[in-house]
């Protein structure tokens, strides 16, 4: 057992070192939570199986052996006329049956870790909104839930789709792996689906030559920027949503990356026009003049999709934020 204790301590130390290096950004380590959770599930699952098939039966056999020896001793003493027997066999049995610490921290945690793994990988995943690119729909600090099966179930870590699901629709708020750096998750709104011609010229959106309907709303006060922005309601897809425009920012798109299928886009002083290639999506933030989106780094391939965002489950600074959104 001392060998298993040492091995387990090394495994747990490895997990702790990885998490610590990730959190402290030591050596440029980029954490992969999906991979970490998968490995934790696999390791604790192996311990759980070993506990059920090997370690627990051995402890039970040892406890039964103690009980049998104690009963034999009682029988011998009874034959000798001695009725009072010293020793607490139940206490010894309890200590033998107790899981050692290295099983408590592995096999004992497996059911919880496995439940989290299944829930996060195939049903719902929580995210925290880190920036203001989706204001006013989503605010910095919103904790949201993402539906992982609407667009098809994908295998964790490798993100390979195993069921078709529904295709993303214009207007959906989608979480995806940032194409220039897939280790990062981004959240934007689906503006163009495969085959669409998307144009954002002079801060007006058109899809396939048709202007997307918008109507003016009262100005939005951004508490972080401490200023008002022009606010509009836009009908993109089945449900309307709000967006912001900054009249002081030019329509020109500066600092564009060299991305795949860039030849499908034409940039001008007025903005950008793109033809969305097959299997890709054109994404934009609702905070139109403060969003690093497809205008800058290109299209999102289907293989990068994580899921559909649909619910704010907590904002510790504003509980009124809890609820669904469009």
Where are these regions (language model features)?
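PDZ/PDZ-like domain segments forming the peptide/carboxylate-binding groove
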Residues: 108-109, 127, 136
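Alpha-helical transmembrane segments in multi-pass membrane proteins
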Residues: 103-105, 131
């Amino acid at each position: 057992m001392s060998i298993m204790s040492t091995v387990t301590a090394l495994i747990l130390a490895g997990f702790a070192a990885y998490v610590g290096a990730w959190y402290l950004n030591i050596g440029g380590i980029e954490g992969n939570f999906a991979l970490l959770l998968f490995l934790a599930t696999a390791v604790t699952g192996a311990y759980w199986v070993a506990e059920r098939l090997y370690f627990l039966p051995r402890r039970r056999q040892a406890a039964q052996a103690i009980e049998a020896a104690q009963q034999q001793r009682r029988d011998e003493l009874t034959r000798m006329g001695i009725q009072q027997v010293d020793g607490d066999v139940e206490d010894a049995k309890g200590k033998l049956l107790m899981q050692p610490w290295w099983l408590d921290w592995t096999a004992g945690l497996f059911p919880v870790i496995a439940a989290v793994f299944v829930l996060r990988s195939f049903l719902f995943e929580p995210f925290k909104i880190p920036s203001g690119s989706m204001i006013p729909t989503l605010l910095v600090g919103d904790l949201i839930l993402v539906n992982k099966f609407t667009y098809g179930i994908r295998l964790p870590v490798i993100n390979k789709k195993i069921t078709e699901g529904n295709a993303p629709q214009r207007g959906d708020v989608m979480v995806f792996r940032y194409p220039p750096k897939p280790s990062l998750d981004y959240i934007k709104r689906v503006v163009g689906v495969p085959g669409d011609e998307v144009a954002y010229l002079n801060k007006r959106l058109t899809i396939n030559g048709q202007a997307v309907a918008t109507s003016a709303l009262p100005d939005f006060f951004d508490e972080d920027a401490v200023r008002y922005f022009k606010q509009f309601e836009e009908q993109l897809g089945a449900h309307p949503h709000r967006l912001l425009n900054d009249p002081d920012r030019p329509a020109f798109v500066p600092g564009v990356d060299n991305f795949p299928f860039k030849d499908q886009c034409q940039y001008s002083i007025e903005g950008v026009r793109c033809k969305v290639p097959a299997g890709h999506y054109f994404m934009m933030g609702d905070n139109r003049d403060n969003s690093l989106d497809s205008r800058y780094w290109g299209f999102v391939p289907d293989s990068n999709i994580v899921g559909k965002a649909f619910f704010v489950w907590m904002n510790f600074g504003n509980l009124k934020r809890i609820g669904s959104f469009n």
